[in-house]
């Protein structure tokens, strides 16, 4: 299975995916990594793993649609079976989402539908939440609103900082994102009727781990 990963920053989830491919936990190969930031450390992670890297800077394009058209063109040179967003900090155009419908995954640092968008850890702290977490979902036109596949929960303790919660959530992200990608690679996971399906069973709104 051909995997293309899109990043904007450190690329810790990218590293987890690369490692899972190396150990055959994911039966696939990361063919290319794209970033909208030339200084994203994730590009160096990719280069160290011998993976092709590409940088597309938004300021070189006159619209989001033009950017996404070029991004589609370059991604499709790698014939991806799945496109994985791993901290890609751009809102994608409807044309991009439609082009990769059913094979476009994202990870979001909250227990969706709670806290779509930015600053999720801060919101969890400010609201006094006792648990927080992360969600892997299919991407649709609704921002962070596509069908949830799998969630992982973490506790929030008194005295926690944003950094504490970030570290706790990222540990879970590095476990569940490769797992979901492996389900996709094995043909177990699909999007159908705007819902996530695993092994032929429609998953509930909060995904596989909803009742855990």
Curated annotation (Swiss-Prot):
Pathway membership: Purine metabolism; IMP biosynthesis via de novo pathway; N(2)-formyl-N(1)-(5-phospho-D-ribosyl)glycinamide from N(1)-(5-phospho-D-ribosyl)glycinamide (10-formyl THF route): step 1/1
Residues holding (6R)-10-formyltetrahydrofolate: 64, 89-92, 106, 140-144
Residue ranges that the Swiss-Prot or TrEMBL entry lists as coiled coil: none
CDD domains in UniProt: FMT_core_GART (cd08645)
Result for mutant: residue 106 to A/D/G/S: Reduces activity about 2000-fold
pH dependence: Optimum pH is 8.5.
Protein name: Phosphoribosylglycinamide formyltransferase
Source species of the chain: Escherichia coli (strain K12)
């Amino acid at each position: 299975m051909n995997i293309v990963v899109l990043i904007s920053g450190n690329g810790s989830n990218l590293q987890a995916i690369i490692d899972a491919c190396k150990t055959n936990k994911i039966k696939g190969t990361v063919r290319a990594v794209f970033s909208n930031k030339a200084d994203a450390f994730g590009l160096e992670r990719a280069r160290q793993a011998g993976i092709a890297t590409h940088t597309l800077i938004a300021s070189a394009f006159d619209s989001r649609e033009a950017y996404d058209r070029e991004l589609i063109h370059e991604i499709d040179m790698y014939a991806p079976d799945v496109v994985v967003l791993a901290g890609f900090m751009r809102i994608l155009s409807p044309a991009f989402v439609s082009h990769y419908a059913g094979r476009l995954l994202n990870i979001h640092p909250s227990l969706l539908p709670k806290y779509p968008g930015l600053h999720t850890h801060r919101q969890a702290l400010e609201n006094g939440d006792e648990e927080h977490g992360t969600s892997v979902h299919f991407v649709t036109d609704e921002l962070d609103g596509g069908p949830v596949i799998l969630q992982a929960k973490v506790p929030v303790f008194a005295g926690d900082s944003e950094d504490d919660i970030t570290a706790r959530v990222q540990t879970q992200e590095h476990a569940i994102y490769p797992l979901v990608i492996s389900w996709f690679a094995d043909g177990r996971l699909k999007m159908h009727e705007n819902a996530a399906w695993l092994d032929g069973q429609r998953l509930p709104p909060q995904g596989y781990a909803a009742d855990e």
